[in-house]
UniProtKB/Swiss-Prot annotation:
Lineage: Eukaryota, Metazoa, Chordata, Craniata, Vertebrata
Family per similarity comment: Belongs to the somatotropin/prolactin family.
This protein's record includes keyword Heme: no
Gene field: CSH1
Protein name (record): Chorionic somatomammotropin hormone 1
Main location as per UniProt: secreted
Signal peptide region: 1-36
Localization, UniProt: Secreted
Amino acid sequence: MAPASSHRGHQWICDLVRGSCLLLLLVVSNLLLCQGVEDYAPYCKNQPGNCRIPLQSLFERATLVASNNYRLAREMFNEFNKQFGEGKNFTSKVINSCHTEFMTTPNNKEAAANTEDEALLRLVISLLHSWDEPLHQAVTELLHRNGASPDILARAKEIEDKTKVLLEGVEMIQKRVHPGEKKNEPYPVWSEKSSLTADDEDVRQTAFYRMFHCLHRDSSKISTYINLLKCRFTPC
């Protein structure tokens, strides 16, 4: 019987293949893994046990998902602003109001590059956790409200699904490179549900604008941090 960590790793890659548009070479390699073909030599950096998924493969898939989430978040934010932002002063209402605003994160890429990899991994995991509830509520509300375009709903649903996949993958990476790491940063609780479900259209639209603005910002951070980590542990 395959080890549980190996099975979870293969399942994560299978989920990613089914939901992401990857380069042909990665698709082929992933499909082989999904079909049970284990042609990789054992490769578990700093982790005991019989694992056959190379660390580089985990990082490649994580960077692809993070980059895709960032693209989707940017497109969703722009689409929402185009559809609902005309004549609205949304920007002034959402400055410094993200629920992740008070997380201590590097101010720029240079600062992130000088941050220890243990801290970056904890930040990525905490940021991903902090978006569990907001994304779930956004998808639920978009499903039951008229007005939002199908494209916005589709992107929100894909980001929700892929954020779960990405979180599992990053947690696997953390266990691989820092097997003794047990502490993660506390993640902020989102408290905007009442605004997101408000009957007042202006309140509701402002809440969605704030969410999509903050998601765009945090998705950029997550993608940047994972790319930096990839270059520390595998060839860039």
